[in-house]
UniProtKB/Swiss-Prot annotation:
Biased amino acid composition, Basic and acidic residues: 84-104
Region (Disordered) location: 80-122, 165-200
Residue stretches making up the Lipoyl-binding domain: 2-77
Keyword field: Acyltransferase, Lipoyl, Transferase
Protein name as catalogued: Dihydrolipoyllysine-residue acetyltransferase component of pyruvate dehydrogenase complex
Pfam families: 2-oxoacid_dh, Biotin_lipoyl, E3_binding
Subunit structure: Forms a 24-polypeptide structural core with octahedral symmetry.
Main function: The pyruvate dehydrogenase complex catalyzes the overall conversion of pyruvate to acetyl-CoA and CO(2). It contains multiple copies of three enzymatic components: pyruvate dehydrogenase (E1), dihydrolipoamide acetyltransferase (E2) and lipoamide dehydrogenase (E3).
Cited CDD domains: lipoyl_domain (cd06849)
Amino acid sequence: MAFEFRLPDIGEGIHEGEIVKWFVKAGDTIEEDDVLAEVQNDKSVVEIPSPVSGTVEEVMVEEGTVAVVGDVIVKIDAPDAEDMQFKGHDDDSSSKEEPAKEEAPAEQAPVATQTEEVDENRTVKAMPSVRKYAREKGVNIKAVSGSGKNGRITKEDVDAYLNGGAPTASNESAASATSEEVAETPAAPAAVTLEGDFPETTEKIPAMRRAIAKAMVNSKHTAPHVTLMDEIDVQALWDHRKKFKEIAAEQGTKLTFLPYVVKALVSALKKYPALNTSFNEEAGEIVHKHYWNIGIAADTDRGLLVPVVKHADRKSIFQISDEINELAVKARDGKLTADEMKGATCTISNIGSAGGQWFTPVINHPEVAILGIGRIAQKPIVKDGEIVAAPVLALSLSFDHRQIDGATGQNAMNHIKRLLNNPELLLMEG
């Protein structure tokens, strides 16, 4: 009897997801922890590894199909694993996890006693067999660093943790090699014959596009949007970035204008805390957030993603620049985790990178404000009674009028303008 592998709950918030890509097909021989498929849900793409070694008998769910946690997605000929049970399987006889059997403690591994703080909310990537192995060894798996692909924890990592050593990197290279061997050139789509004077084709709405559509409609239906549009002379900002661009490059940092905007926005959120709240009309509550996490809208081939710079108030411009660049690469490669896209208190949308100027950005609900930045263009301005050319930045600030009054919104915009006009103030007030 084949082992039926069901779509698991792997701790990434996935309750259903679209099978974006299969890395295996019927007849393939696989090893435990090989990547079976990529599953996409609500803007994140997660790799699903195999819990067993064996031969793929049948792929049950086609690419582009949405599966629910617990659905059988692939059958694997793995006789030794038929009785294994995994989180997400709904068999009544195995609804509870068996506690580790009490046996004679012959050469029982010492319980890990490291005293470092452990983030109990941390998302852990590990196979069920590895989780069981960690329990048997008395190790809190959330304290273990993973050396496998995408940070996945292996048995060797648990052993290294027990020995007080660093995790081995051999598994990462092995996983990469396996991924390269399994990856195949996707077949070219069948040619479509267009007939008639007004030919049309249809396609299923991708999971990410559905998620984006749902979020946009919910935001516009829930929050009465008001958008303020303004502009500011950024000659000093231009010169400041130019001055430190080479210094940043020497330490491997690509310095752009966006980190300056992040710091200016954080300062505005602190000065006008109404912009750093959520408005819960159903509960009759306003949620005040005493942390400053900035979402950065990123355009990708899959659609709009919003990775988050956590605790932006605690980071330097160089640090923010590095983090934005790293998140942007992950976004383009489809490697962002759910954790990297949640927790924002306010968002920045940069239409300037596409050549845009002013626009009406949609609030990333349940946030109550979003700052849009346009292109920097040379424009004539009046300075000391004379008309001169200067680089001018376009700004658009949308806010939820249930929570933020027009004057508050404009005052916040003025504060951002003031800091971007004189970036040295970021050291004093940012």
